[in-house]
C-alpha cells in the first residue's frame, strides 16, 4: 500500500474480484485487484477498452459491489454497510465526473451545482454561496444563470466538475472526462481538475486514453489480466 506508514488511504481496494456472465461463459474482469488512493494525489488509469476501467471506478465509488474483496473509504470497510449508509458515503465522500456531463437541462449552471448540496439537506443560502464560489474558481462566474444548452462543451464539463466537488468529497472519480472534447478544451478541463486536487487535497482517479494528460499526473496505473500495474 506504501505512502506514509501512519497515513490512511482515502480509498483502498483490497483483493477485488469481479466476474460477469456472458451466455454460458464467465468473464473475470478484476482478479485480486489492489489499489490505494491518497489525499492530494492524482492517478491516471490507462488501459484498453474492455479491460475493466469503468468497473473498477464503479466499485471504488460504491456504485457496484465486488464478488469478493473489500473497499475501504477512509479506513472504513464498506461491504457490511447498509444501502442507506453506502448512499450517504457516495453523497458526502465521493464525486463523479463522466465523459458526458449529465447536467440537468432545465437547470442553470448554478442550480446544477446546488443540487447535490440540497439533497444533503443544506440550507439554500449555503448551497448558493458554495456553488457560486466553485463556479467562480473554475472561471464560470459569468455563466451561472446559463442552462447547459447555452454553454460550450468545455463549460459544460467544468460545471459537471463543480457539481462533483460541491459536497467537498474525499475522492473524485472521473471516467474519460475529456473524451468528447477537442485537445485545447480538454487541456482546460484537465487543468481545472488538477487545480482542484491541489486546492482541496481530494484524491483523484481518472480513467483516460489520453497519455499526454496521464503523463502530467502523480501516478499512472494500468489493468493487466485483472490486476492493477504501476507504470513508470
From Swiss-Prot:
GO-annotated cellular components: plasma membrane
EC class name: translocase
Subcellular location as annotated: Cell inner membrane
SMART domains found in the cross-reference section: AAA (SM00382)
Entry annotated with the keyword Iron: no
Keywords assigned by UniProt, alphabetized: ATP-binding, Cell inner membrane, Cell membrane, Membrane, Nucleotide-binding, Translocase, Transport
Main location: membrane
PROSITE patterns attached to this UniProt entry: ABC_TRANSPORTER_1 (PS00211), ABC_TRANSPORTER_2 (PS50893), LOLD (PS51244)
GO biological process, one term: lipoprotein localization to outer membrane
Pfam families named among the record's database cross-references: ABC_tran
EC nos: 7.6.2.-
Domain ABC transporter, first and last residues per copy: 11-231
Source domain of life: Bacteria
Gene3D superfamilies: P-loop containing nucleotide triphosphate hydrolases
SUPFAM superfamilies in UniProt: P-loop containing nucleoside triphosphate hydrolases (SSF52540)
Amino acids binding ATP: 47-54
Topology of this chain in the membrane: Peripheral membrane protein
The keyword Cell inner membrane is assigned to this record: yes
Single GO MF descriptor: ATP hydrolysis activity
Family: Belongs to the ABC transporter superfamily. Lipoprotein translocase (TC 3.A.1.125) family.
Functional note: Part of the ABC transporter complex LolCDE involved in the translocation of mature outer membrane-directed lipoproteins, from the inner membrane to the periplasmic chaperone, LolA. Responsible for the formation of the LolA-lipoprotein complex in an ATP-dependent manner.
Complex formation: The complex is composed of two ATP-binding proteins (LolD) and two transmembrane proteins (LolC and LolE).
Name of protein: Lipoprotein-releasing system ATP-binding protein LolD
Amino acid at each position: 500500500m506504501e505512502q506514509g506508514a501512519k497515513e490512511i488511504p482515502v480509498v483502498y481496494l483490497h483483493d477485488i474480484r469481479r466476474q460477469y456472465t456472458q451466455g454460458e461463459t464467465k468473464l473475470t474482469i478484476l482478479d485480486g485487484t489492489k489499489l490505494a488512493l491518497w489525499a492530494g494525489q492524482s492517478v491516471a488509469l490507462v488501459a484498453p477498452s474492455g479491460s475493466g476501467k469503468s468497473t473498477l471506478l464503479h466499485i471504488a465509488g460504491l456504485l457496484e459491489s465486488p464478488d469478493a474483496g473489500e473497499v475501504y473509504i477512509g479506513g472504513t470497510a464498506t461491504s457490511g454497510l447498509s444501502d442507506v449508509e453506502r448512499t450517504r458515503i457516495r453523497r458526502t465522500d465521493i464525486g463523479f465526473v463522466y465523459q458526458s456531463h449529465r447536467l440537468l437541462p432545465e437547470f442553470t449552471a448554478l442550480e446544477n451545482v446546488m443540487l447535490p448540496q440540497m439533497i444533503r439537506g443544506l440550507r439554500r443560502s449555503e448551497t448558493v454561496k458554495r456553488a457560486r464560489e466553485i463556479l467562480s474558481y473554475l472561471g464560470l462566474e459569468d455563466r451561472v444563470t446559463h442552462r447547459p444548452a447555452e454553454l460550450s462543451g468545455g463549460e459544460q464539463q467544468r460545471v459537471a466538475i463543480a457539481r462533483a466537488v460541491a459536497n467537498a468529497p474525499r475522492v473524485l472519480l472521473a471516467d474519460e472526462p475529456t473524451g468528447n472534447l477537442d485537445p485545447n478544451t480538454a487541456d482546460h478541463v484537465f487543468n481545472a481538475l488538477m487545480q482542484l486536487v491541489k486546492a482541496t487535497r481530494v484524491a483523484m482517479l481518472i480513467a483516460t486514453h489520453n497519455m499526454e494528460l496521464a503523463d502530467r499526473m502523480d501516478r499512472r496505473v494500468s489493468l493487466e489480466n485483472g490486476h492493477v500495474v504501476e507504470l513508470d
